[in-house]
Amino acid sequence: MVDMSASPSGTSANVSRSIEWFEKAKMFTPGGVNSPVRAFGSVGGQARFIDRAHGSTLIDVDGNEYVDLVCSWGPMLMGHAHPAVLEAVQKTIVDGLSFGAPTIGEVELAQDIINRTSVEEVRLVNSGTEATMSAVRLARGYTQRPKILKFDGCYHGHVDSLLASAGSGVATFALPDSPGITGAQTRDTIVVPYNDIEAVRAAFAEFPGQIACIISEAAAGNMGTVAPQDHFNEHLLAIAHADGALLILDEVMTGFRTSYRGWFGVDKVRADLVTFGKVVSGGLPAAAFGGRAEIMNMLAPQGPVYQAGTLSGNPVAVAAGRASLSAATEEVYRTIDANADRLHGLISDALTREGVAHHIQRASNMLSIRFAEGEGHNFTDMKNADTFRFAPFFHALLDHGVYAPPSVFETWFVSSALTDDDFQKIDDALVPAARAAAAATA
């Protein structure tokens, strides 16, 4: 349980060791973290340093326990330290950590991915960013075209050409979204609103025969959770193919999270290329991209498009990924879906009792909260809400032992490991959290 004694962090939990380690971390690491969202920048307060985890529970360095509704941003389908995954990793590491040569496990993981999705061939890489970067390069190499089209609010890793925000107008050249990215690097990136199929058509009309690919999250999870509307992905595929372009669906987040077959299991759209991450690694650093064989065969050494990686197909990560996919049966997904429905209901009931305008955004078992009436369909909708209510809501949950995503624009993830006791703890924590959200002012 969380120690509710006062602490100098401004929270009601004892987080003295997290404070100590965060101050030390800032001496050696920019901002004290290795990925920005971990710093609690958008919600304020003290980031928790996690010591260990099991099942649905995170335990920080001060001994505080939390019900985990982040699941390492998606991959922990069955909770932390799942016995089958740990056994596979432990069995593999005694034979070596990395060989820089082909292994049987690489072939077997590729087969596992192919058997559950629409892709015909797979290349293993080390991160979701690397997967999307490689897929875009491959699309450009295959089509011999320079431009790419992406959607405002969709995140595809920190690739220079994809880390771009929308400028003005319906179909527009992108503006760099970070210092260090030049206009030249985003000049060939077109950004349009998500779920706006007419904006996509307008972009292709403005740049006929120039767009190599459309890249989109299969279901958006980085502007909050926003599901594709009205057969959006299907229309994207048709528009791309009519112009000779490709469709890349980014399933780094949704792949093997939203169903046994990922988002492909939801809408059955056979994209030309698909990127995977998170679940395919079992929580270790690994990812993949795949697609139609004629496109994938453009990759070196078979074709001219270069892509490589010393640690790609790392045997330990491959073992974890295979074990995770194997253990994630259809029954596991039914449990995850039911748990997401249960969490949805608890959050909505608590906010309704306090009169807080809200909509629970859903994409299968992924969810987030929009603090406004009605469903958000794009990034503008998600920003046009009472986002100021989220920080006090988040901290009340955290102080009562519930670990939610530390940003209103991040997706909540549940595991099959959640118990009735966990849901009771969540329900209890939602009482002060909803009150805090109701009392918040801009």
From Swiss-Prot:
SUPFAM superfamilies: PLP-dependent transferases. Keywords: Cytoplasm, Isomerase, Porphyrin biosynthesis, Pyridoxal phosphate. Its main location: cytoplasm. It catalyses: (S)-4-amino-5-oxopentanoate = 5-aminolevulinate. It is found in: Cytoplasm. One of its GO terms (molecular function) is glutamate-1-semialdehyde 2,1-aminomutase activity. InterPro entries: 4pyrrol_synth_GluAld_NH2Trfase (IPR004639), Aminotrans_3 (IPR005814), Aminotrans_3_PPA_site (IPR049704), PyrdxlP-dep_Trfase (IPR015424), PyrdxlP-dep_Trfase_major (IPR015421), PyrdxlP-dep_Trfase_small (IPR015422). The keyword Isomerase applies. Its cofactor is pyridoxal 5'-phosphate. GO terms for cellular component: cytoplasm. It comes from the Bacteria. The modification N6-(pyridoxal phosphate)lysine is found at K278. PROSITE patterns: AA_TRANSFER_CLASS_3. GO terms for biological process: protoporphyrinogen IX biosynthetic process. It holds the Pfam family Aminotran_3. Pathway: Porphyrin-containing compound metabolism; protoporphyrin-IX biosynthesis; 5-aminolevulinate from L-glutamyl-tRNA(Glu): step 2/2. Its EC number is 5.4.3.8. Homodimer. Belongs to the class-III pyridoxal-phosphate-dependent aminotransferase family. HemL subfamily. This is Glutamate-1-semialdehyde 2,1-aminomutase. It comes from Corynebacterium efficiens (strain DSM 44549 / YS-314 / AJ 12310 / JCM 11189 / NBRC 100395).
